[in-house]
Amino acid sequence: MYTGQSDHRPEGVGVNPGSPNVMEPGGGVANGAAVTPEGHYSHAPSSALQAVKKNINHMSGLSLGLRVSEFVLSVIAFSLMASAEQNGAVYSTFTSYSFVLAINVLVALYAIGQIILSVMPLVSGSAPKKLYLFITFGCDQLSAFLLMAAGAAGASVAMLINRKGVIDDYGSGCIDGKITVFCAHAEASIAFTFLSFFCVMISSYLGVYNLAPYLIL
């Protein structure tokens, strides 16, 4: 029946009987899914990159354990070397032993910083930044090289003392027992230096694993 009222709709508004969505003025959609404006696309990260970042987060726990080991081993190493003293013999008498102590102090400080930075991804659940991974890899390489050099230098001096002794001020050195405690502390410090070196090397290998996706993808 004609009621005298015309059915007027605002321009741009239409109803599709076969669709649950009703267009409203301004181009919106009522009772339906949101429409992405033309020219805008959602770019989801690739599944490969997502998997890699997930694995990196899982490796953060192992990395943290290695950092703690590096710190503990380096602290023990420089503590033993600093306490190496007997009958006037001290670590500063030998340049290589001073080098061992100095490098272990540096590595211990570096490990503290890495422990703090390693906790952050575990707490936040986010993947480390690419720049951080590159810097960490370089620092790990440098730390490993310095620890290896210090350990090798200290080991060569320890072998020289054990085989030929130190004739000048300490009799026959470790042979006649005048500085056996000094020798024992120095040798133990060198051993812990090498253990710290191996932990840093493993951390460096993990750094390669973490960096690989950013270099390939």
From Swiss-Prot:
Parts of the chain on the Cytoplasmic side? 1-61, 120-141, 209-217
Region (Disordered) location: 1-21
List, alphabetically, the GO terms of the cellular component aspect: plasma membrane
Lineage, top-rank taxon, reads Eukaryota
- TM regions (residue ranges): 62-82, 99-119, 142-162, 188-208
Q: Where in the cell is it found?
A: Cell membrane
Q: What is its main location?
A: membrane
Assembly and oligomerization = Homodimer and heterodimers.
Q: What is this protein called?
A: CASP-like protein UU4
